[in-house]
Amino acid sequence: MENNRTGRRTVRRTAGAVAAAMRVNRQLSIPIVTTALALALAACGAGATGQNVGAKSTAQGGGSGPSAEYTDDISVGVKPDQNAVKLLPAAVKAKGTLSVAMDLSYPPTTFMASDNKTPIGFNPDVARLVAAELGLKLQINNVKFDTIITGLQANRYDFTVSTMGATTDRLKALDMVDYFKAGTGVSVPYGNPQKLGTHTLCGHHVGVTSGSTQELQWLPQLSKQDCTSKGKPAIKAVSLPSVNDALTQLVSKRIDAVMYDFVALEWAATQQPKTFDVLKPLVTTKPVTVALKKDSPLTPAVQAALQAIIESPKYAQALGRWGLQDLGIKTAATAVPQD
């Protein structure tokens, strides 16, 4: 979940789970983060956008995201949307299959089920729904995130559903269509003993990962907005190598809070009960996108399919079962740069 992936399950507590979760830093065992959670959270932090999961947090926190696997095909029963189907290129319609690229190592949006063969998460759900709305079969390709764009450009895949943020550079190479939101959140110790809020962090030590958008943009902006511009002490940024380090320091009370991709923080709270609370409101949310090769003849059909999904009950179902219910959008708009 790159800090703007702004990207993807139940973290399996077995050797197989650790391997599959290899890029998501998440599951803290007091006073340090367990290996499985660390690997899981690493994945979230390495994604495409700075992912977020909007589970049932409250102003006081209270991570309560999904803890079950949903391996059923959410697209069962979906009838093709004829307005989208009529936009399909003849070659794609004749082939009868859509090829999607995604990196299946980002719970809870994009990952592998405990059977180690079934792609699950919000992004596979959306990809399956896109194919169903277009009356096509779906082929899911599990590839490294940093190879997806070149794969699209080389026509190895038709599209990607990877929680990918729209940047100026990406928009030069890709067609990008919004499909939900992701953002930055703040975690505090369970029970929020200091009664902190997203906008009451002045003077407190807040962990951020080195080089992240949280360190470079969102924490300084929040500090100026809420604190220094009002004569209050600045938020004290504590730069750390990884979110795993930050959450470990939070558990050991060396810092007061952690600012990071919301999806990773919420998943950590879900997988390690009574360890963290995730504050509401979020620091920021921005749309993330489905992407295709620049000027792809398939883009209009995929965009129409996404709009049909958003307007259907399946969209709320997919968001809700992965703890993303606060992050839906109403329009599958052509993306604009978010950098």
Put a short name on every predicted segment.
Residues 39-43:
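C-terminal motif of bacterial Sec signal peptides marking the signal peptidase cleavage site
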Residues 137-200:
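Acidic, polar ligand-binding/catalytic clefts
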Residues 57-82, 132, 192, 199-205, ...:
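Extended ligand-binding regions for polar small-molecule ligands
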Residues 164-171, 219-220, 251-284:
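A ligand-binding cleft/hinge motif common to bilobed small-molecule-binding domains
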Residues 107, 117-133, 164-165, 185-242, ...:
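Bilobed "Venus flytrap"/periplasmic-binding protein-like clamshell domains
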Residues 45-48:
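Bacterial signal peptide processing site
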Residues 53-161:
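Extracytoplasmic small-molecule ligand-binding "clamshell" domains
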Residues 181-188, 266, 270-307, 325-339:
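Periplasmic-binding protein-like
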